[in-house]
C-alpha cells in the first residue's frame, strides 16, 4: 500500500484550537516545543506523518490490547461521537495507523504528534486537551536500550544534560517491557506541589517494546522489533519554565502565552 506523504506534526499543532491565538510574530509555546522535538528526531532519521485526531476503537484500544473493561474505554474518560468514533486519547493509535500503511517493512522510523483528548476535571497535571509526540522505530537491531537512550537524549536536548532524570518500569497493555522517564519537579520542592502531587518527580516520557500481538497488528515482519517513545509537551514546558501547572500553556490569553514563548 502506498503511504501518505509525510508532513510535520507541528503543522497539526498549529491547527489546534489554541494554536493561533497569539497575534503578530509570536509563536505558541507548544508549537515551538513540537518543532524542537521534530528537529531532534529528524536528525536521527525519523520521518514525520500527519494523522487524524478523530479515531476509532480499533486503533485506540483493540489492536493495542487494551482490555474490554479498561477504564479508558469508558465515556467517562473518552470523548465518543454518536457513531462510535472518538477523539484521539493518545498518539500510539497514530503510530499504529502509520505502521499499518506499509505492512512488512523491515525497517522504519516514524514520528507522529498532535492534540489528544481525555474527559477529566482540568487541573495542574491533567487537562481535557493536551499534546503528545511519539516516535517509533522498527528493525532487526532495534531494542529497549535504543528507546531508553533516545528518551534520555531527547531530554538532554530539551532540558539540558543536568535534568536529573530517573528511569522506572511501567506497565502498559501494548508494550513489554515498558518504561517511563521522570524528571525532578522543580517548582516548589514537592511540598504541596500540584504538578508532581508531592512525589518529587514528573513523568515526561513513556515507551517500550511493542508486544508480539501489537507488532503483528502493526504489520511488523518476523525478525524485526518495534519500539516507541512518547513525550508530553505541556509537562515538558512546565518543567522548562519552572511552573507547577500545565494549564498556562492552554490559556486563551495571548499576553500570558507570549511570556512563555
Where in the sequence are the language-model features?
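TRNA-recognition modules of translation machinery and tRNA-sensing kinases, especially anticodon-binding
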Residues: 2-261
Amino acid at each position: 500500500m502506498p503511504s501518505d506523504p509525510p508532513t510535520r506534526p507541528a503543522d497539526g499543532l498549529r491547527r489546534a484550537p489554541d494554536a493561533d491565538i497569539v497575534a503578530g510574530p509570536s509563536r505558541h509555546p507548544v508549537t515551538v516545543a513540537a518543532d524542537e522535538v521534530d528537529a531532534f528526531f529528524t536528525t536521527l532519521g525519523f520521518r514525520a506523518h500527519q494523522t487524524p485526531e478523530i479515531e476509532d476503537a480499533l486503533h485506540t484500544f483493540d489492536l493495542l490490547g487494551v482490555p474490554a473493561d479498561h477504564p479508558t474505554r469508558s465515556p467517562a474518560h473518552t470523548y465518543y461521537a454518536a457513531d462510535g468514533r472518538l477523539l484521539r486519547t493518545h498518539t500510539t493509535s497514530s503510530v499504529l495507523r502509520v505502521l499499518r500503511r506499509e505492512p512488512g517493512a523491515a525497517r522504519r522510523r516514524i514520528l507522529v504528534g498532535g492534540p489528544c483528548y481525555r474527559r477529566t476535571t482540568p487541573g495542574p497535571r491533567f487537562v481535557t486537551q493536551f499534546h503528545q509526540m511519539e516516535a517509533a522505530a522498527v528493525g532487526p537491531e532495534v531494542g529497549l536500550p535504543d528507546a531508553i537512550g533516545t528518551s534520555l537524549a531527547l531530554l538532554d536536548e530539551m532540558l539540558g544534560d543536568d535534568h536529573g532524570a530517573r528511569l522506572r518500569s511501567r506497565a502498559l497493555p501494548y508494550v513489554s517491557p515498558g518504561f517511563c522517564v521522570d524528571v525532578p519537579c522543580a517548582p516548589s520542592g514537592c511540598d504541596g506541589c500540584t504538578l508532581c502531587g508531592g512525589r518529587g518527580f514528573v513523568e515526561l516520557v513513556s515507551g517500550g517494546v511493542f508486544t508480539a500481538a501489537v507488532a503483528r497488528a502493526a504489520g511488523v515482519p518476523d525478525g524485526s522489533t518495534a519500539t516507541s517513545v512518547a513525550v508530553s509537551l505541556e509537562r515538558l514546558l512546565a518543567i522548562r519554565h519552572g511552573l507547577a501547572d500545565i494549564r498556562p500553556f492552554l490559556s486563551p490569553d495571548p499576553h500570558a502565552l507570549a511570556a512563555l514563548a
